[in-house]
Amino acid sequence: MTRWAMIADLRRCVGCQTCTASCRHANATPPGVQWRRVLDIEVGEYPDVKRAFVPVGCQHCEDPPCMHVCPTTATRKRPDGIVTIDYDLCIGCAYCAVACPYQARYKTQRATFAYGKPAAHESKRHDPDRLAVATKCTFCVDRIDAGLATGKTPGVDPEATPACVN
């Protein structure tokens, strides 16, 4: 079975945060919740120090520690390697957030919007089931599944590719 992976060429990343913005827009995450973020790090030693940018999100681990600590089995791994959360089963204990070595899980207690009231794209994509439960990068599984169902190729066809990659 295919196992999805995301590879970023760090030599080409300029830290523009476009991946972060496109993920936030596609998933209508509330302020402060970044399923995809870009770390700004220093590489080398003085006087030859360079800046590097590293996009980070859920790594959809081969053996996810978040899945093993979940008391309700809300965190699951699909056969294709994508780690998902069943919001109906999640009790919001946040054990998974503590277990995640990439700090890629968030828990939002209440609905918050960038400008107090939801913008058009926020209301359309706002999911009330994601309140008081753990959330994380979904690898845009809805886009991948819909694309595969219509014969599109993830990574080639934008409609079938995670938003942060486009």
Question: What kind of region is each of these model predictions?
Answer:
Residues 1-166:
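Non-ligating segments of multi-cofactor redox enzymes
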